[in-house]
Amino acid sequence: MKRILVCGLVPDVGGLEKIVLDFYNHIDTSEFELEFLLQGPEDVEFSDHFKKLCHNPLVVHRIPKLRPHMKQALKEWDRFFKENAHRYDILWSNQNGLTHLEFLKLAKKYGIEKRIVHGHCATADKFYRFIHPINRLFVGKYATDFWACGTEALNHFYHGQEREKALVIHNAIEVEKFIYNQEKQVQLRKEYGIPEDCFVVGQVSRLYEKQKNQSFCVKVFSEIVKKEPNSRLVFIGRGDTEFLENVAKEYGVADKVIFTGLTTNVGKMLNILDVFFFPSNFEGLPIVLIEAQANGLPVVTANHLPDARILNNYDKSLSLNDSLEEWADKILSVRDHRELDTAKVKQLIDENGYEIESATKQLEKLFNE
């Protein structure tokens, strides 16, 4: 039995949390025991949404956040690792950026032999662009294994010897949960008051403007409406709706933008869409792009983002600097390109390494090395 301490997750479910959860739900729990380290107050818990998605026991340990009282927090972190490190064979540190190396440092200091850093993002936001490249120089001093969700993330996280050793671990999914279902599409559109013959564009993601660039979606949608008035923009996820509502009002499309809120069933909700639109400012290799393609959806994303192409109806030809009208035309041009051959979809996802059972076997093999 290998015992693994999982770090870097937050209490709610974002892309990173969902990736780790999917692996945990499929891992052989007779061979691997995972425990989770959360930052926050003593009563911090994973959200009900997280717990609902998790099918295995959740053992959670808590340490304080680094900020604003970093000195005191680091003392508590040191105490936790000093008292508990002997219980673990592996540290699995999941990170969107190399904002700090403390988990890896403490794991090494107190004798956790296998120390994995797993990169989930291919660019850093402005706040971390200074510290990430510095920590990139030293990550090899503390980690033993170097993983990334894709080639772009691998190059962003590692250089030199670490890059040569690094492995790509695909963000894998349970394909059957995402296969297109026309009956569910009809049902969902009725539920949200969308006419059956309406053109629906949208995305699944946390509403987080700095990264996800959702105001750009609204602006492009305002151009789509000029060309196809019978259209809707659907945001599936929770976050700052007020900001986007104001943008929608400014561009005159407030009555055509729908916020569904949080969902525990992404596969079902994807059926409501005709095109998946994802013009983020930065990403690693978003699992939602794999999920959207499993649903057969045409995907339109920006050309600076990592390439998650599996199906031929995946388009990343445009830049965020291109005009709103060009984006609108591109989205409308693929509106009828949903891939309905489910056998083909399943085969391509498996061949590209995104099928969860195969990916979990790879993960288990690496944990055992």
In which residue ranges do the predicted regions lie?
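A short helix/loop element that forms part of the nucleotide-sugar donor recognition site in Leloir-type
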Residues: 76-79, 179-194, 337-338
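A short, active-site helix/loop in glycosyltransferases that binds the activated sugar's phosphate group
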Residues: 142-180
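Aromatic "clamp/platform" in nucleotide-sugar-dependent glycosyltransferases that forms part
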Residues: 262, 281
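N-terminal strand-loop element at the rim of the active site
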Residues: 2, 6-14, 18-75, 239-241, ...
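Nucleotide-activated donor-binding/catalytic signature segment of Leloir-type glycosyltransferases, i.e.
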Residues: 245-261
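A conserved mid-protein helix/loop that constitutes part of the nucleotide-sugar donor-binding site
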Residues: 17-22, 199, 203-223, 242
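Short hydrophobic beta-strand element within catalytic cores of glycosyltransferases
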Residues: 298-302, 307
